[in-house]
From Swiss-Prot:
Coiled-coil parts of chain: 86-148, 224-411
GO biological process, one term: Golgi organization
Name of the gene encoding the protein in the UniProt record: GOLGA8K
Start-end of Basic and acidic residues biased regions: 352-362
InterPro entries: GM130_C, GOLGA_cons_dom, Golgin_A
PANTHER family, A to Z: GOLGIN SUBFAMILY A MEMBER 8H-RELATED (PTHR10881:SF62), GOLGIN SUBFAMILY A MEMBER-RELATED (PTHR10881)
Region (Disordered): 1-76, 352-379, 424-444
Gene Ontology terms: cellular component: cis-Golgi network; Golgi cis cisterna; Golgi cisterna membrane
This protein's UniProt keywords: Coiled coil
Protein name (database record): Golgin subfamily A member 8K
Family: Belongs to the GOLGA8 family.
Amino acid sequence: MAEETQHNKLAAAKKKLKEYWQKNSPRVPAGANRNRKTNGSIPEKATSGGCQPPRDSATGFHREGPTSSATLKDLESPCQERAVVLDSRSVEISQLKNTIKSLKQQKKQVEHQLEEEKKANNKKQKAKRVLEVQIQTLNIQKEELNTDLYHMKRSLRYFEEKSKDLAVRLQHSLQRKGELESVLSNVMATQKKKANQLSSRSKARTEWKLEQSMREEALLKVQLTQLKESFQQVQLERDEYSEHLKGERARWQQRMRKMSQEICTLKKEKQQDMRRVEKLERSLSKLKNQMAEPLPPEPPAVPSEVELQHLRKELERVAGELQAQVKKNQRISLLNQRQEERIQEQEERLRKQEERIQEQHKSLQQLAKPQSVFEEPNNENKNALQLEQQVKELQEKLGEEHLEAASQQNQQLTAQLSLMALPGEGHGEHLDSEGEEAPQPMPSVPEDLESREAMSSFMDHLKEKADLSELVKKELCFIHHWRDRRHQKTHHLLSEPGGCAKDAALGGGHHQAGAQGGDEGEAAGAAADGIAAYSNYNNGHRKFLAAAHNPADEPGPGAPAPQELGAADKHGDLREVSLTSSAQGEAREDPLLDKPTAQPIVQDHKEHPGLGSNCCVPLFCWAWLPRRRR
């Protein structure tokens, strides 16, 4: 652009210069041209200023006479005209020189302006390039900002949705909190009522209950010490087994090293045998070629039979070595094949075990959390709850390697504690286990079985799992034994008051107690009342299970009619019958039986049918018996 403007300016300056020259160019007058044509050589003479030398003028004057003056006049006029023309031309030349100087100055100015314009254009181009680069960077920054804005909008939407979800959850939790608070208030009200009822009992009954609770506390302490001793024994066995596993691990590592060394030696022997076979094949081919070559026409000497026999023996020996080597290679290949088959079988077993443990891990994740119970324990069953807590801690320490056995143990403990708890509380504590088999977590099977460390760690892990499962089984056996001992002790305590328990169970508790005197009669009557109440409690438990098996509208096959329940309420002075009937009514009307929390009770009754029909009376239920009226 700058060059084009410069060329245009130069062209305009040239045009102006041409116009100026055309305007100021000198024009010769027409009279002067005529004088040049008519006079011939007269203008040449006039070049000397129109003056002739005196010699010529004198000669002319003398020669021509009167005509010389006329010619002189005629010559003076063009000379004067030419002088005027020359003066005008000199003036024009000076003017032209001035104009040329002015034009040169203008040209210099124009060139200087062009250079300045070039510099300005270069600066503008540089600035333009810088601006283009800045525009590109701004566009890139704009795109980045747009992407950041898009991501920020997405994250904002995500956080808004999350906040909405959290608000909904908070609302549900608040609702649940209100429900739980209402349930807790109801429970507290029932507990207050029960406390008021218990406060109306006699002082002797409370003292007797305290004695019984102290006995139970002593028994539970003994059992707790036994559990601690068993736990210490289990820890010692675990340490011994860990040492045994370390020795087994070292032995397995040594065996793996030996196997790897044997494999390396077999590979080396195989390579050496292959080389020997190649050498023998080459020697055999050479011997065959030597035997196949035709005899020369004139042999220098016929080979003897001894040499031929020697060659045959050599050939047979080479063939025998070759066959032996082939057989050896076949045996090595068979050994390698068998070893590969064994490794594949081990991998298949490990894969099946991995799948089994993965299935168990999936079922473990489906377990539900235990249902929280909002009942404050009384002074009588605090020790039992502490025992349950210690058993849970022991179960957590043993781990979740065999959760099926641990769940059975927990169910048995909760059943025992529910038998030991007060039957009037209605609900009792139970775990909300959803169910099914609880698999042990799957150990990750190492893919690279050839690595010694992975194989040894995998075998160590499997043995630890087996050890833990055995420990859980031993703990279950111990708990079963403890449960049987508890039943025997309760039977023994029931049979202590002098053989009156049987008659009292049949309904004669009041009369038998009246026959005796003092505290013995009171204890016997309490035992009779406890047996009758517990029999009614067992009947109510069976009815509850029957109602759980059957629908809510249909009564169970062994469930009595409501009239029978009302009659049972009127029989005697026992309040526990009304509690069992109310428990049955709740079992029929309660919609929670359709929920998973009521299913483990029915499942426990199916798996252990002896729990509902056991006639042992827990000692804590005597604390709930009404005072016998004398």
